[in-house]
Amino acid sequence: MEYEFTLKFAVPANNPSVDELVERLGEAGCEVALVGIGQAGRIALEFTRDAASAKTAIFSALAAVKTAIPSVQLLEVTPDFVGLTDIADCVGVSRQNMRKLMLAHKDDFPVPVHEGSAALWHLSPVLTWLRERAHYAIPSTLLDVAHIAMQINLTKEASQIERGVQRELVELVA
């Protein structure tokens, strides 16, 4: 199956030129990735990768990037963090329709991971809810990629928790 996802990285300043990085990425198996370098010190790679599973597609891409540029630091795997407009775009409805659906089901619509001037959700639980509760036709490949992206992003963030704090928090947040 074909899986579409984006890997975003921080690149240390002491790395070679962008052209050299792109060449290394190609040699490591990322030759079909669309490379974005719009912000200094950042690189984004958009993949459409054929694999047996989303996990295999994303993990093999991560491994290839780390082989090509060992000093990069993963910032985010997408699609994962989304606003209401992003969710609406994913399922092909207007933002207003998605907002109406969310408000009509406020008791069981997935809880955002951040509420501020704009709320943010993990895409995976929202897509699962839309498929199971609202009967939207969500492509399995999108759902699988969103799930693995969320798992990777959560793991990356959780790795920053101090061990002592983590033990105490497990009971408090469960």
Where in this protein do the model-derived segments appear?
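Conserved short beta-strand edge segments in small beta-sheet-based binding/regulatory domains
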Residues: 32-38, 63-80
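A short, exposed loop/beta-hairpin motif centered on an aromatic-Gly-Thr core
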Residues: 42-54
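Short glycine-/aliphatic-rich beta-strand segments at the starts of folded cytosolic domains
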Residues: 1-13, 82
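A short, Lys/Arg-enriched interface patch at domain edges and termini
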Residues: 125-174
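Polyanion-binding surface elements
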Residues: 78-100
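Major-groove DNA-recognition helix of helix-turn-helix-type DNA-binding domains
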Residues: 93-119
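A short, structured beta-strand/loop element
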Residues: 17-42
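Short, conserved charged micro-motifs
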Residues: 13-20, 53-58
